Amino acid sequence: LFSELSVIDNVKIAYNMHVTYNLADAIVRDGKYLSEEEYITQKALELLKIFHLEEEAHEVAKNLPYGKQRRLEIARALATEPKLLLLDEPAAGMNPQETKELMEMIRWIRKEFNLSILLIEHDMGLVMGVCERIYVLEYGMKIAEGTPEEIKHNTRVIEAYLGEEVIN
């Protein structure tokens, strides 16, 4: 997050990787520059609307509540038009309601943007609620792989995360 920039500028920066104008075009503000800037502004506003951030478009990003900052980070990532979206502990610091909203948002993103999502997360409710396939690590080593249902009943996973006494 670029905390000192506005919400819309945070998203526009990500779209800038797709512009074709050069520095000279930007300095003289020629037609190519102006039309591309208008285009990325409109695209950024569309993403902000999707993530319910359009009313905060001109607010400084650091002034947003934590949950909205997370949504802004995801919107900015989607502006790069990825094929794979990496979400590293997106629920960290969120309250249960924000986590529930995040779960719904991740499901919607996967469907609407037709992309793969790599989720690294400790909130098992979120993991079980959005993942089709789960890889479980213990001390950096893979100990299990499978569907949420398979992982939920995997004795090795239960032992590693809840303790051996839970199994016995």
Question: What function would you assign to each model-found segment?
Answer:
Residues L1-N168:
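Glycine-rich phosphate-binding loops of nucleotide-dependent enzymes
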